[in-house]
């Protein structure tokens, strides 16, 4: 079925021509060899372009690790990132101009690229590249097939190699600053009421930072698709894992609507109460993502709901670089549920997001060289360069064979300038979590238990020691993977207006963006909640839930074929 998107497109041809003119060229020689790397026959480096529909930081053209990787693989990729548009708008611009980079990850805009015929089918290539072939099981590759039966993209994340090694909770949680926990002598925080009372009490006793800057007790990110920081907390408060668009009863395998639950009412009523008390940041509903990150980076924000990947590598590094960790400004997850029930937020095993991934476009003039580069990036030598860096410069190897970093190396790794000039993780290309081939080391520093703990700021170490844990994961607990349906967001993220359920999903998003801020700010909560519920029910959510249920049933049926 063809898909449709409603997209605002501006500066179409000009933008596309500016960004991606000359895609995939290597200084005049386009006859790249794909054997043992992608270097052209005359030794020149082949250059590709890539666009990722998420915000990111560009690295310097003379980046040191990128150059080392280029010398070893024969390829260098110029990466560009999303600025000033949604993913769908940016992709719509490219589609309208019919000009593309060599590589692309369009996020929620992937269906537009597929419909436009902009992507290269990968089926006939995968078997030629062993690292790519082994990246997924046969079942997982089959899950990536589109309605025409072909595979067009490779999901880049949550692929676990060997033994799982996880120290960070990369997903959604209630976060609170270490200074708040220390002030309260590291209390047990189990409920939503516990969480907000602690923030209230701390802010009443300590309304400013050391320099006199006022705290922001609690802020909410609501911009564009990131409004999950506001709207989907009820499913987590009820203890469910992150299916994103619904909850799933693991016994009956039925989808449930968290938007209308009793917990949803209690949660939004609590936010309303905290807003009236001045605890919720009044700029929450108008701030941009950049403004939100700037607030976190300043150390002023005591608590928030967010996903680790959405703030840690920006605000976390900024806090460390500014020395604000010495004031206890790092964020720690706490297992908050509505009534203290067990949470299922962190799950073992990888999560296959079949809804988007890295694709190669029709404008790539050497698909085999592009895929050889992806294959090379998954080799252990290059993967270590991407995530550990250069041995002796970015990390050391102990007598026991374990990788570790010195204090100076860790400090450098957090510096913005050093990351731009030296580090090159090719972060939106396929990658592994888990264990290296040596069976000892984690594929990334964040998974190396001793290195992870040694590299923690002192405020986090003190908190972990007080709670008797060594990782963020242990703060929350871990659970087995929920089931073959999981996660449902990999389906709902690509809903389109072609179906009744997809139209309902679009309308629900619009209603939430408009109504939920009003619910939080209203003087009369009950009246505002009724207005919101009336608008929500008018969106025909049953159609949306019905399509989710059909997809869940399909996933369970497909999984049964491989049992």
Task: Show where each model-derived region lies.
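Ligand-binding "clamshell"
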Residues: 112-125, 150, 207, 314-344
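Long, K/E/R/D-enriched contiguous segments that form extended
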Residues: 283, 293-339, 350, 356, ...
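Bacterial N-terminal signal peptides that target proteins for export
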Residues: 1-10
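C-terminal motif of bacterial Sec signal peptides marking the signal peptidase cleavage site
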Residues: 18-22
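Conserved N-terminal structural module of periplasmic/extracytoplasmic solute-binding proteins
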Residues: 8, 23-194, 206, 232, ...
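Carboxylate/His-rich catalytic cores and anion/metal-binding grooves
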Residues: 117-145, 199-203, 213-248, 302-326
